[in-house]
Amino acid sequence: VVAYFQPVTRVVIDQVRGVDSAHSLALLLDRELGLMTLRRAVVRPGSRAMEFIKAACEDAYDRLIYPSLEREARSDLTDAACEGAIANFGLNLKPLLMQPPVKGHVTMGLDPGYAHGCKVAVIDGTGRVLDTAVVYPTYGPRQKQEAIDRLSRLVRRHGVTHIAIGNGTASRETEQMAVELIRQLGGGVSYMMVNEAGASVYSASKLAAEEFPEYDVNLRSAVSIARRMQDPLAELVKIDPKAIGVGQYQHDMPQKRLDETLSGVVEDCVNAVGVDVNTASASLLGRVSGLNAATAKNIVKYREENGAFTGRRQLLKVPKLGPKAFQQSAGFLRVPESKSVLDNTGVHPESYAAAEGLLALCGYTLADVSAGRLADLPQKVKALGWEETAARLDIGVPTLRDVAAELMKPGRDIRDELPKPILRTDVLEMKDLKPGMVLTGTVRNVIDFGVFVDIGVHQDGLVHISQVSQKFIKHPSEVVSVGDIVQVVVLEVDEKKKRIGLSMKQVPKA
């Protein structure tokens, strides 16, 4: 039995959840102080019943008051821990959804496995499936070379430039096969390890069966892994956020509260990026503010029956998508094929008049927006005065700034401004790691006691919270988020226990 003592005011989330799971939390109060306080309140000195009331106080304290205080303290701590864990889950989920896409490349997805082999799917730059296969690189040297030969033919046939490898079972052997494949091809191809959490859940879902009725469950997961590299957000919205694997103690939390928080995070991310109504799936459209699963399916059905949308206003022809839903969703829906460039921006139709007025005031036209000739727009608005210009256009200054930003980059994807994912052509082994080595890695998970970083080895390394920053922090999320590209220095390597200790604060300054 291990005794652990900590003041209630200083207990942190993971300690509360850990203690809760062991059902061993005990509140330690000063009994004499509690009894003295109780006696002062109810015992009248000199009373004939004084001794009886004192005894009653002791009984009440031991049998009723103390257990009640303990339950209340435990409940308050657990509630606070749940709220903190839910908030942490949301903090981790957002950057995972907002990972920069690797767009427009023919991509090969590899879903590693032993008994059932490695499932392979090749998709084009739009996510359309071109080819599938199953290879068995773990069955022996001959089968491994046969797998490499088959993948090599697929790479050459379809012009594959990127390989996405799931990070689950047999991923180490699959990564080694991919590196050997790239070597035998003579370059021109790079790979990335992809978090495959939830891929198996999606592949066995009704949604996946509707999307890929002709493919086996295992091949669907390979397609999902490839698409996660091309556009993480569009693929991950198809999966229950709880299955993505970036939280702590999610099964112990109030599920309704957790679902509400995570759904809000997903919706915020989808709205921030924007959705192309002519290519988006119903799953993605259903996450846009103002739309639901039914209206999203109606948009896809209308698109299939009538061809691509040619303007935002055309959305009003979609069954069950009324004026209110249009008002709420229009600003987040993009129509690149529209004759009006404003339909491919985040400018809401209600602000089109203001946008055109702003262009006129600054000597521009919509043609200049399409051609990207608005580099001097902020300077021209500044010369006119932001508040004065907003007043002339009858909008607020924040709206004016948003409109100006959208006009300068029509069709922009805010994820493109984030650090690019790390693409590799070679693999590191744990035995290659030495204390003092400085490496670049990708943050895979942020939890209460530290940060897990993918440094290109099969095992993620841990940066303990004490090694995250030179300054004191209460939580690693104050410094890093999931998906961040960070520099780390190797502190220790334990091959037997498969543990890698890393530090961010000890990285030598350039």
Residue ranges and their predicted role:
Residues 335-339, 343-510:
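Single-stranded RNA-binding regions, centering on S1/OB-family and related RNA-binding modules
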Residues 16-26, 293:
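Short amphipathic alpha-helical interaction segments
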Residues 27-106, 125, 148-153, 157:
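Extended, highly charged clamp/arch subdomains and adjacent linkers
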Residues 5-16:
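Short acidic, hydrophobic short linear motifs in intrinsically disordered regions
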Residues 84-97, 103-106, 115-263:
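Phosphate- and other anionic-substrate recognition elements at nucleic-acid/protein interfaces
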Residues 2, 25-28:
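Basic amphipathic alpha-helical segments that dock to polyanions
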